C-alpha cells in the first residue's frame, strides 16, 4: 500500500518547472497529481532529457531550508522532552517520518532536545529538498509525458471537426 502526502512541492532540476500538490509514493516510485502535472507541463524537456533527470521534493511545501532552520529552535522548545519518533510536528505520514529519521541516522528514541546540530541539519535538508534521480518512464500513462496532440490548424473551430478526417469530431 502506498503513502500519500497531501501537499509537497516538486522541482525538476535544470529547468524552471515546479509544481505543488498531492504526492503518492508507490512501490513503483513517485506518482500522484503533482508528478502527473509536471510530466504534462514538462513533456518536451523530459523527452529531451531522454527521461533521465533529477527532481527535488520539498516535503514541507510551506517551508524552505532557511525558514525551517529559523523555526527549529521553537520546535525543540515545544517538543524537547518528547521522542522524535513519536512526535512528528509536520503531519507527515508515520512511515515516511520514520524513513526520514532512518535516512538521517536519527534514533526514533532520541528526544527532540537531544538532536545534534548535524542531525538537525540532515533532517532539515531532507525535509525541504530531498533529491531523486528519475531514470525512465512507465509504459502506462505515456500520455502524460509524450507531447502528443493535434494541431489547431487541423480543426474547424466552429464545428470541432477534423479538417483532415471528415466526420471526426473533438470534444
Which residues make up each language-model segment?
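An anion/pyrophosphate-binding glycine-rich loop and adjacent beta-alpha core
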Residues: 1-114
Amino acid at each position: 500500500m502506498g503513502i500519500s502526502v497531501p501537499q509537497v512541492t516538486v522541482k525538476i532540476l535544470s529547468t524552471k518547472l515546479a509544481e505543488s500538490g498531492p504526492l503518492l509514493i508507490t512501490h513503483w516510485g513517485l506518482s500522484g497529481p503533482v508528478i502527473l502535472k509536471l510530466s504534462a507541463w514538462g513533456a518536451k524537456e523530459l523527452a529531451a532529457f531522454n527521461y533521465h533527470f533529477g527532481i527535488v521534493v520539498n516535503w514541507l511545501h510551506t517551508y524552505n531550508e532557511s525558514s525551517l532552520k529559523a523555526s527549529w529552535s521553537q520546535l525543540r522548545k515545544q517538543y524537547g522532552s518528547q521522542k522524535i519518533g513519536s512526535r512528528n510536528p509536520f503531519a507527515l505520514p508515520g512511515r515516511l517520518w520514520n524513513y526520514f529519521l532512518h535516512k538521517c541516522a536519527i534514533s526514533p528514541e532520541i528526544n527532540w532536545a537531544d538532536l545534534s546540530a548535524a542531525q538537525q541539519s540532515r533532517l532539515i535538508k531532507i525535509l525541504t529538498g530531498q533529491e531523486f534521480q528519475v531514470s525512465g518512464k512507465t509504459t502506462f500513462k505515456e500520455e502524460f509525458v509524450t507531447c502528443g496532440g493535434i494541431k489547431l490548424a487541423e480543426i474547424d473551430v466552429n464545428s470541432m471537426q477534423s479538417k483532415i478526417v471528415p466526420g471526426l469530431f473533438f470534444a
